[in-house]
């Protein structure tokens, strides 16, 4: 199984979108500071993930979500969660 996941980085209030084949292990690495992209943005919180049978499907979805249209749709889909977290919508790429 392959996963696309979204983290909320509490320090800067931004999102991180990633891909992995082992979700539990990857989240532990993020939380422990072993991932450079989120090391200085901790604490982090897993707010969403999707599972895929094929690696290519997961990678395509990750790429789409990181793009403008996909990211906009993501914000709409997760609006209730993001509002509770105090996510700043204006002028944010992630």
Q: PLM ranges: what are they?
A:
Residues 63-76:
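Short arginine-rich
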Residues 22, 37, 71-74:
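Short, electropositive, low-hydrophobicity segments enriched in small/polar residues
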Residues 1-35, 42, 49-53, 57-63, ...:
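GIY-YIG nuclease catalytic motif and its immediate N-terminal context
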């Amino acid at each position: 199984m392959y996963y696309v996941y979204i983290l909320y980085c509490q320090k800067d209030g931004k999102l991180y979108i990633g891909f992995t084949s082992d979700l539990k292990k990857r989240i532990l690495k993020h939380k422990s500071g072993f991932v450079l992209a989120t090391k200085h943005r901790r604490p982090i919180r897993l707010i969403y993930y999707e599972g895929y049978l094929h690696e290519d499907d997961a990678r395509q979805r990750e790429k789409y979500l990181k793009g403008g249209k996909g990211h906009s749709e993501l914000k709409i889909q997760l609006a209730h969660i993001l509002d509770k977290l105090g996510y700043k919508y204006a002028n944010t790429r992630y």
